[in-house]
Amino acid sequence: MTAQGNIYGINGPIIYLKGDSGFQMNEMVYVGTGRLVGEVIELTSERTTIEVYEETTGLKPGEPVTGTGAPVSATLAPGILTSIFDGIERPLNAIQKESGCYIDRGIHADSLDTKKKWHAHMTVKKGDRLYPGA
């Protein structure tokens, strides 16, 4: 079950929720009715602090915040080498198709085409020891 809360305060890209709302540190969350992407950056018994990675203009106290149950992460795969992304790994070409030259708030786009097959040559096999920097 994912954690949920409501916005209590807003200060630029930082929003606050009252009390312990059940989120985890570094958890990716969706903020407001526009489902803006954010990350939990502080947890105390009094409040939860979240940094929103999109423009927060128009957000207001009382709007919902929904957790994903997973940390903010990036997809690593051969397909990302030929794409250009914004700061939260949304491919700019997919965003342009959806919103034109400007990035609308709350746009969600997969960072990788999951239908495409990627050919990879594995250089390790089961049981091999791996070392840092190798």
Task: Write out the residue ranges for each language-model feature.
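Acidic-enriched and Gly/Ser
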Residues: 2-3, 9-11, 17-134
